[in-house]
Structure formats: C-alpha cells, structure tokens
Amino acid sequence: MEPDGPEGVESDVGAFDAFYLAFSTALGGSDEPDMAGVRIGRYELLEEIGRGGMGAVYKARRADGAFEQVVAAKLLRRDLGTEALHAQLRNERQLLAHVDHPNIARLMDGGRAPDGRPFLVMEYVEGTPIDRYCQERGLNTDERLDLFLTVCEAVQHVHGHLVVHQDLKPRNILVTPGGRPVLLDFGIARLSELDVGVAEESPA
C-alpha cells in the first residue's frame, strides 16, 4: 500500500545509528521478525538498526526509482495495531508534516505496511548525542549554553504546531559534525501511552 505522508522530498540526508537508540531502547525488546528486504510503500527496508517495545527501526532506501534517498523507517509491532494507536499516529503524522525547522528531524513520509502495520519515515541524521558531543569536544559553558538555547528555540517552534515531545533527553538530541543540534522522535512517547494502559493526554 502506498504511504499517505508528505511527498517530493529530494534532499540527501546523513546516517548515524545513534539517532535511533532512543526509540529502540525506550520500552524494551520484542519478538517481531526481521523485516529486512521487505518493501513498505516506496521504501525498501535494508537492515534493522534498533528494536524496542513499540517496534523496530530500519535503515531504508527509496525504492520507486524517483530518486536516491536513505531514510529511517519506524515500523510498529503487529500487536500494537489498535485503532486508537493508528488514529493517534495519523494525527501525529499530520501535525509533524507541517514542522519545518533546521533543528528538528523531518518527518518525510508514512503509511501502512503490507500487513497493515503503521510506519513512519524519518530523516536519517548524522551526529552525536548532545551530552557526548559536549564531552568529546570539550565545550565550555558558553558553548554548551548556545547549544541548549538552540534546542529550546526548536522546542518552542514545534510547540507552536501543537506537538509535545514528552521525552526530551540527551540521546534524543544529536549534534551534527557541523555543530547543529537536531531534535528526534517527536510523538513517539505519546504513542506508547495508548497501548500500555496510560491515560491519553491532549496535546498542549
């Protein structure tokens, strides 16, 4: 089934597996089979790079011949296929599709896999978790504050689109080799609440 998310994104993106640690370790493991080699919508899943309680994250590539593109595909578990979760995922995807900010990882596409499971296609970001970046680069207090303020501006921007992260932590913020912090995984924490018995909250 063709995805129903935003189309026509032609920019090249980098690759760094640490981007997906937050998603793949947030809620534990699962017994889902490896889907490498399967095509979902316009994308072929190349290799699994993370797995967690909500599903798995794959390195993927655009496979419809339109252009070359490497992305991250987040595929939900089969047993999380409740209508409430699907509806929430659609809502989050629609909100995130309108977010365009240099310090927020872009939602690029989304839809349902051949077996009916929802998936998200996200920008593949090259970078280092912000805490490790600061330590490895030996940043002083002013330099760290500059990064922090940039992150705050990105959070403020996305809040203006009625999206709340709810899981901000160092491994959800990568800093690119050029020093640009990028926020990751908006909406994922909220989605997990719907299937683990936690009351749903309205976006603030």
Task: Give the positions of each predicted feature.
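Low-complexity, Pro/Ser/Thr/Gly/Ala-rich intrinsically disordered linkers and tails that serve as
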Residues: 1-27, 141-142
